[in-house]
Amino acid sequence: MSIEAQKSSCNLYTGYFAKLKIYKQENLIPVSIAGVAPSWYTHSNEFEFKKLAPKFWFYKKYKDGIFAKEEYTKHYLNEVLSKWENPNTLKQELIDLFQKENSNGIILLCYESPNNFCHRQIVREFLQINEYRTSKGTYNDK
């Protein structure tokens, strides 16, 4: 398979920082989509894609209980995801930037555990991708 064919068939997943070690063991390329990644995250083989981070103003209103999940989602869709015409454009941008030969895919990371609402759920729905499931356990946001 050519590199271009590998790039276009890249697996994309979502996950959270607490499971980073497992994702790396399973040969996934970690990409932070948080506004601020953890200080320990800054290694040479870890990436950030701040274009998918929520805007601080509506993130803070959600965390402070001023915005409900629905209001946060509306702002995230309008102010962040609206930059892409369609999900395939965003998928291709992520693949072009981060996919490497011999990896098992790209995993988009944030802080929240699977049981808590997070913008990565909105991203996952927009891209029609899955929370990563591993042989060491299932990490599913449902």
Model-predicted segments: where are they?
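Residues lining hydrophobic/aromatic ligand-binding pockets adjacent to catalytic sites
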Residues: S2-K142
